[in-house]
Amino acid sequence: MNEQAEVEQFLNEMTYGCLGTTGEDGWPHVTPVNYVYHQGKIYFHGSRNGQKMKHLKACKQVTFLIAKEYSLIPSYYTDPEMACPATAYFKSVLIKGTAELVEDPVEKAGALQAFMSKLQPEGGYRPITAEDPEYRPRIKGVAVLAIKIMEMSAKFKFGQNLHEEVRESIIISLNSRKRELDEETARLMRKYCPAHKDSGNDSTEA
């Protein structure tokens, strides 16, 4: 799996991110929103008259952050006295782009259907199409926005900079602690370590 595919897999896995906009007062605003990554864009929806829409009318440039914390790593895993080694392992993706109101009903329906497929994969609803007469007024009424991605950077931090013996010691401690996501963190530490990358596995930025 290459780096771009790994980042896109993370975008498809997560269900919400933080939208950064600039308010009319010049202050930055951050709003958590559900999203879907669909056909190379970030889509989200909401009211046509909400605060987000006011901000976007004033400035279409936005940032969008998706992040997931995996495990907190206590300092004593690697140093018996100093607090400095305490850290956290995580994945994050930062997107810069422009947000546009989607007017085309076919594109809107496609984005909304992608939302449902992601957030309600078990089904239990009629598929959303622009041609469906019952969906048509609802599609028209909701504001769907698309972020056209201009720049995307990812950071997956899992101890890639550590010496092998230190990394293995943390992995052993995580597998023994067994908190939620500890075992997954240990697996990702092995996956992303430079030795595994050199042997043919891809990694993301340290």
Residue ranges of model-derived segments:
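An N-terminal domain-cap segment
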Residues: M1-Y43, S47
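A general structural signal for short secondary-structure junctions and capping/turn motifs
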Residues: Q9, K52-L56, Y135-V142
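A generic structural signal for short beta-strands and their flanking turns/coil linkers
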Residues: T15, T31, H38-G40, A58-V62, ...
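Catalytic micro-motifs at enzyme active sites that drive phosphoryl/nucleotidyl and oxygen chemistry
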Residues: T21-D25, K52-M53, E81-C84, P133-E134
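A structural signal for short, well-ordered beta-strand segments
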Residues: Y35, G97-A99, I147-I149
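Short hydrophobic-aromatic micro-motifs
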Residues: I42-H45, F64-I66, I95, L145-A146, ...
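Short, structured beta-strand-loop surface elements
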Residues: N49-A111
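C-terminal edge-of-domain segments
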Residues: E103-A206
